[in-house]
């Protein structure tokens, strides 16, 4: 899949691993990878390490996980899952992708309360670090730089009734 980071097209591939439970049921787990020759050397490092780098690097990683993960789910499954489960805040930008895809304007205008509520109904969030230090916070100027001003404003417009956790 391809995502946009700072106006650049970043290719993301997935590695599939199946976990088999005691009952024999298999659950696929996908690992996202940006170490592709068509990406810039810096973009290739985004999936090298978890919990590394400065705020800029971390936000770019969260774009890969949240928006890249959503793009992968959309590419693999012709029908959308009913519920999206986000573990910790690292994938929270998935909600912005959901908001854009469910928006009447395609994310070009501020989301309505009904659109924000529809995203809320599709999401489950689990945290294992229920303290402020366990959740990334990014300045709006950095968000605007990484996501682009229009996407950043979509998130800002829904901040008061945010599905973004």
What are these language model-derived features?
Residues 1-165:
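Catalytic cores of carbohydrate-active enzymes across secretory and cytosolic contexts
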């Amino acid at each position: 899949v391809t995502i946009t980071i700072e106006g650049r097209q970043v290719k993301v591939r997935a590695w599939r691993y199946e976990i088999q439970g005691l009952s024999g049921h298999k659950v696929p787990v996908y690992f996202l990878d940006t170490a592709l020759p068509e990406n810039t050397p810096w973009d290739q490092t985004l999936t090298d390490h978890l919990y590394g780098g400065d705020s800029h690097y971390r936000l770019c990683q969260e774009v890969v996980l949240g928006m890249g993960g959503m793009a992968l789910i959309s590419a693999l499954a012709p029908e959308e899952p009913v519920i999206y489960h986000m573990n910790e805040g690292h994938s929270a930008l998935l909600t912005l992708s959901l908001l854009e895809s469910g928006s009447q304007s395609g994310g070009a205008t501020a989301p309505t309360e009904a659109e924000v509520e529809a995203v809320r109904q599709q999401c489950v969030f689990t945290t294992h670090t229920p303290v402020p230090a366990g959740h990334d916070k990014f300045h709006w100027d950095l968000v605007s730089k990484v996501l682009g001003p229009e996407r950043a404003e979509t998130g800002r417009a829904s901040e008061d009734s945010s599905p973004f956790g």
